[in-house]
Design a protein with these regions (language model features):
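Bacterial N-terminal signal peptides that target proteins for export
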Residues: 1-10, 17-21
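Exported/periplasmic ABC-transporter solute-binding proteins
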Residues: 22-62, 66-73, 78-104, 110-261
């Protein structure tokens, strides 16, 4: 009898261990670099809380959309709201009412210790761009939201041609603030959470409100995901007070938590 009980106990231990293994999952995530600094800090916290490990691929939202449309898949897409809407329309993702979890605007940075120009008004910002020897922003040809918007903004301000000869672009998925640190540009303009993640810069401030572009970040479950429950848990985690505190520290504005979370 004791041998039988021991065998049953061993089987029970094995089944419990297997149940624990089943619960833990690797969540494949495609994420825009706009929230990279925040998610790099939050991913291990989520894993510690749930046992589920996010495996994150970083790129611009535009690049990730192209990859998904070409046939790649992920359990969770963390993109700009505009990009997620494209994939949802194509039936590549499913986005719920809690899709949007944070937003951010664009900001200007200089090399650490360098003089900070006045950018408090649209006219002052325009003059700061004209006075700069070189500026850096994301290449609009790469499809990044901030680069596309800022190129159009230069046209709107009437200085696009004037800025062409003194504009530098980082490589795709790169950060324009790195060009400032390297001495290749006087000013860098990019999403605030992206430039805040670079060492060796000083924040000048956000673009004037009339010129700024607010980007919403959203998450959706990839079509055909085998880890939909774990991915859904990660979306809920992005609305938690712990996550919201991290977003604020990285230059993001947390979205209001949806009801029931």
């Amino acid at each position: 009898m004791s041998r039988t009980m021991s065998r049953l106990a061993a089987i029970a231990v094995f089944l419990i261990a297997q149940a624990g293994l089943v619960k833990a999952a690797e969540v494949k995530v495609f994420s825009t670099i706009g929230v990279q600094a925040a998610l790099e800090e939050l991913a291990p916290k989520f894993e510690q809380a749930t046992g589920n490990k996010p495996n994150i691929t970083w790129a611009t939202a535009a690049i990730l959309v192209k990859r998904v449309q070409a046939g790649e898949t992920a359990d969770l897409m963390v993109l700009t709201k505009q990009s997620l809407d494209v994939l949802t329309k194509d039936n590549k993702t499913t986005a719920g009412a809690d899709a949007v979890f944070a937003s951010s605007g664009m900001a200007v940075v200089v090399k650490k210790g360098a003089p900070k120009p006045d950018i408090s008004t649209p006219d002052a910002f325009k003059q700061a761009l004209i006075n700069a020897k070189t500026i850096a922003y994301s290449d609009p040809a790469a499809g990044g939201a901030s680069g596309v918007y800022f190129a159009k903004l230069l046209e709107r301000m009437g200085i696009a041609d004037q800025m062409k000869g003194k504009t530098r672009h980082p490589p795709p998925s790169g950060n324009s603030a790195n060009l400032v640190v390297a001495g290749e540009a006087d000013l860098a303009i990019q999403q605030e959470p992206e430039v805040m993640s670079v060492a060796g810069i000083d924040m000048v401030g956000p673009l004037p409100a009339d010129l700024n572009n607010i980007t919403a970040y959203a998450a959706g479950i990839g079509a055909g995901s085998q880890q939909a429950d774990a991915a859904t848990a990660l979306i809920r985690f992005l609305h938690s007070p712990e996550a919201q505190a991290v977003f604020k520290s990285k230059g993001l504005k947390p979205a209001d938590a949806p009801k029931g979370t």
